[in-house]
A protein has these predicted regions:
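N-terminal alpha/beta PP-like core and its mobile active-site loop of ThDP/TPP-dependent enzymes
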Residues: 2-205
């Protein structure tokens, strides 16, 4: 970390670690979040989106969007809801796998009832069972995670490739911000996040 995190409103800025040509699926997702001009993502860290978390830190330097650490997924979504109400601009919330999404459901329902745009990103363990670690990935993987919140989101998706993820994020943003507004949910496969792609390929995805 760079030593510039003192004083009110200061933000820790990590020393960027990516080598030229060393890019991942989660990097394309992080860059797309920047292109969508989401200023913040509120999150409670979880291993299902470790790839995206890494990209937000090591590729983007924890800015545009900046991470806001929360202690509970319901808090993360509620913060995004409140930010949109005050500023008129959406922000993101990231929730961990099936358990984090279940924690977030009440706040997502509130945003739905309030017709407020909230961009909720989630993740699941590797959909390909051959890539799952024993036990832990199995209990954090679902075939249709979006079913938990489908009745009170405008749109949900679980893209199966990096190009599809970029398309999904753009579509989710448009759906979320088209009146009547409301929350959307995009679930990212852990293996998709950790798939290696080239630098040019990463830029082409966004």
């Amino acid at each position: 970390m760079s030593d510039n995190a003192s004083g009110p409103g200061a933000v820790e800025r990590p020393a960027l670690a990516n080598e030229p040509g060393d890019y991942w699926g989660s990097d394309a997702v992080a860059l797309m979040l920047r292109e969508l001009d989401l200023p913040y993502v509120a999150l409670n860290p979880g291993a299902s989106y470790r790839g995206l978390h890494d990209s937000l830190v090591n590729l983007l330097g924890n800015r545009d969007p900046q991470m806001l650490l929360c202690l509970h997924e319901e808090h993360a979504v509620a913060i995004a809801h409140g930010y949109a109400k005050v500023t008129g601009r959406p922000m993101g919330a990231i929730v961990h796998s099936n358990v984090g999404l279940m924690h977030a459901t009440m706040a997502m329902f509130n945003a739905w009832c309030d017709r407020t745009p909230v961009f909720v990103l989630g993740a699941t363990g590797p959909v390909d069972a051959a890539k799952r670690r024993p036990w832990i990935d199995w209990i954090h993987t679902a075939q249709d995670q979006g079913a938990l919140v489908r009745n009170y989101t405008k749109w949900d998706d679980q893209p199966a490739s990096v190009p599809a993820a970029a398309e999904s994020l753009l579509r989710a943003y448009r759906m979320m911000t088209t009146p009547p507004c409301g929350p959307v949910y995009v679930c990212l496969d852990a293996a998709l996040q950790e798939s290696k792609i080239g630098r040019a390929s990463c830029r082409e995805r966004v």
